[in-house]
A protein has these predicted regions:
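Structural motif
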Residues: 23, 65-66, 120, 141, ...
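Alpha-helix-loop-beta-strand connector modules within alpha/beta enzyme cores
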Residues: 50-70, 94-96, 115-124, 167-182, ...
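Well-formed, non-transmembrane alpha-helical positions, independent of function
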Residues: 17-18, 92, 116, 137, ...
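Active-site beta->alpha loop and helix N-cap motifs at the rims of alpha/beta catalytic domains
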Residues: 1-6, 11-15, 21-25, 30-119
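Generic secondary-structure signature for well-ordered alpha-helical cores
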Residues: 60-64, 95, 143-144, 171, ...
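Catalytic alpha/beta core domains of metabolic enzymes, predominantly
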Residues: 108, 125-239
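C-terminal extensions of enzymes
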Residues: 235-272
Length: 272
């Protein structure tokens, strides 16, 4: 199987369970919302410094369990976060563990930060991708990076929630990058059920990140939910990957909503 399997979780105990179930794990994705759900964070409030210390402790534990894998660690970025602030956070987080991919949002500032970071050898995972144009912008902004250094994370479930076929986005990104140099890998994210997981395997996504519940269902060969029939398809766009990244339309309401949600979950952990 060419597709790598990641666990989507901010809990090292789930990493242990996934390793026990699957025998191997290629990586893990974390984000502020998942860290806020970590059992050790429940009902607690931290200073900003303590939150980062807690996040570091969690990813260090995960990294120790899957030292050969990738662990995605997300910067705190709201719509006003400056490029320099993202870069500085990313550099700091990159020192936490030797196998990190730093998650940045697909916004103008996020892409500028990513472009600078890959030139310094820092690996990135560009998150909250909801359009093929956003994925193309990631490719163009990170030119010169090597395979394995850049992930783009199309979010399936959140498009499905809007009655749009999120799997089409994954398929279109995989197809588009066939014409590229291979430096960006498609990391299918926001899988909601076993159908999503299996469909991404079939369409050849480079990586799939799924929660523990779905990985268990997959391993146990549980019944697969029916393909939804009420979703609006997403047509393929013929995009020129050689264009400057600034020429692609990177705006999407779900990217903005996703950033707001991550920030809100993070802020709830912090003492007023």
């Amino acid at each position: 199987m060419d597709t790598k399997i990641f666990l989507d979780s901010g809990d090292p105990q789930e990493t242990r369970e996934a390793l026990k179930i699957l025998g191997n794990l290629d990586g893990q994705t974390t984000n502020p919302s998942l860290i806020a759900k970590n059992p050790q964070a429940q009902g607690k409030k931290f200073t900003t410094k303590e939150v980062y210390s807690f996040y570091r402790k969690v990813v260090e534990e995960i990294s120790g369990l899957i030292p050969q894998g990738s662990v995605s660690v997300e910067v705190y970025a709201d719509k006003n976060t400056r490029v320099e602030t993202m870069i500085n956070q990313a550099k700091e987080m990159n020192t936490w563990i030797p196998n990190s991919h730093i998650k940045l949002p697909i916004t103008q500032n996020g892409l500028e930060a990513a472009s600078a970071l890959v030139k310094q050898g820092i690996r990135v995972n560009m998150t909250l991708c909801f359009t093929q144009q956003q994925a193309a912008a990631v490719y163009a902004a990170t030119k010169g990076a090597k395979k394995g250094e850049v992930f783009v994370s199309p979010f399936i479930g959140r498009l499905d929630d809007k009655a749009i076929n999120g799997l089409d986005l994954v398929k279109n990104c995989v197809e588009m990058f066939k014409a590229g140099d291979g430096h960006v890998e498609v990391l299918a994210a926001s899988t909601r059920n076993l159908y999503h997981h299996l469909a991404c395997l079939e369409m050849g996504a480079d990586i799939i990140t799924s929660p523990l519940t779905i990985l268990k269902q997959w391993q146990e060969k549980q019944p697969v939910p029916a393909e939804p029939t009420n979703l609006q398809p997403i047509g393929y766009e013929n995009l020129d990957l050689n264009k400057p990244w600034t020429e692609f339309n990177i705006q999407h309401e779900l990217t903005v909503a996703g950033i707001d949600k991550f920030c809100s979950d993070w802020d709830q952990l912090i003492l007023p």
